[in-house]
Regions:
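Surface-exposed, interaction-prone regions used to assemble/regulate multi-protein complexes
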Residues: 2-157
């Protein structure tokens, strides 16, 4: 490999890494899969990283964007912008019904230890790079959002 080929290869690797961190690519990465009627079975957070586990999988999409079959168990890793001191600053969790009640992350984690979070809808906003999951547990309607997402990794468990 000559110097020019090596330079081109390195530049391509740099371009790919930059593309991974754009808001548009977060949207594309997130919505390569379908989340409606899937379940978050556990959540783990450390530092500026949020890991959502889908033990029953997430939906694979066909060429028209329609949900087809469930994947193998998957993990969605969300990396949060460094302007937050911790992942908790990027979370907003609301239980809603007749009234709206704000919840702490630890409460959501406790609920997940008892049962899975069923997802009705998943939204993404370019404003502050925010992902919102709407759904809940058997007797609780919950929306939780994570803002400042600057990278997403979706992988098999």
């Amino acid at each position: 490999m000559n110097l020019q080929e090596l330079h081109t290869k390195i530049q391509l690797q740099i371009d790919i890494k930059i593309e991974v961190n754009t808001m548009d690519s977060i949207f594309k990465q997130l919505f390569q899969y379908g989340y409606h009627d899937t379940e978050i079975t556990s959540i783990d957070c450390e530092g500026l990283e949020v890991k959502l586990n889908f033990d029953k999988g997430i939906y694979l999409l066909d060429e028209n964007g329609n949900e087809t079959i469930l994947s193998k168990p998957m993990q969605v890793i969300l990396k949060i912008s460094s302007y937050s001191d911790s992942f908790e600053e990027s979370f907003e969790i609301k239980e809603y019904g007749k009234k709206i009640k704000y919840l702490e992350y630890i409460t959501l984690k406790k609920y997940l230890q008892k049962e899975s979070f069923g997802i009705s809808m998943c939204y993404y906003s370019n404003f502050d790079s925010c992902i919102l999951f709407d759904g809940g547990f058997s007797k609780r309607n919950i929306m939780f959002s994570i803002d400042g997402v600057n990278e997403i990794i979706i992988q098999e468990l």
